[in-house]
Amino acid sequence: MKLRPPRRFCRPLLFLLLALAVCVSAQSGAAKYAHPFEPSEELIYVGEFSRLLLKRVDVADFHFIATREPHQKVDGPATSAYALKLTGDISSRGFFSRLFNFHFHERIESTLEPVSFTVQKTKRIDEQGKRLRESEILFDQANGKLVWMERDPNNPAVGARSITTTFTGQVYDILSAIYFLRTQPLEVGKTIAVTISESGRVYRVPVKVIEKKRMKTVLGHVEVVRLDPGLYGPDGMVREPGQLSIWLTSDSKRIPVAARLKTEYGTFDITLRKIVARSQPKPA
């Protein structure tokens, strides 16, 4: 009999990997750029799993890249000469794939207007074993409306699912939500509310700033701040028990260096392993 993890096991892990890794795209701090993650940057993490006698077994690789790209045609005037493109790519590895005979791969591409920092479009590819889904979110921030569409490339006759949702204020996908947190004053004891769209629904996610401390990281011993996003619970994005914590450097770069997700299945530790400098010409 083959062991296969349920989908509700994979989704929280994928969210954790994305949330942590995208945060860290804030490494480069050159003052000549509008944001510390410009003009381009790549970040590499490793995810590990622990339960009982299993201690920090490799389960996933993930890479995240922030780049500039030329503006595409969108509703309303462009306020910048370029768009920001955030890309997150996550795949299973090693023990996890062999134990469960199961492969997952997720890729998200998010396009933002950099001056107003509003999301324009999100594309997603989600592979879990033989299951494959492609989805897209089109954001109309000015009119408070988004359209989510999902299709099964292996079964095109079924057609695409579509959900239209209205919202007030600023709404983000999971990538841009983390970038938004980096721009906020992270004062211990405060709670920051972030509105996130996931699978056609809109969630209000409270993010608590828990504490500051020193931590050993790939960057050395640095001061970090701990954030606890409220993703779990009956009204949360994940409707089962769990606790997610993310540690970011407390300086202006806000580099996420570690994260931990505790679930009924075990504990997942995510660790920054490498920051890759990438060169990219300025847009014309």
Residue ranges of model-derived segments:
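Acidic, serine/threonine-rich low-complexity disordered tracts
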Residues: 27-139, 183-284
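Active-site/ligand-binding surface loops and adjacent short beta/alpha elements
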Residues: 140-198
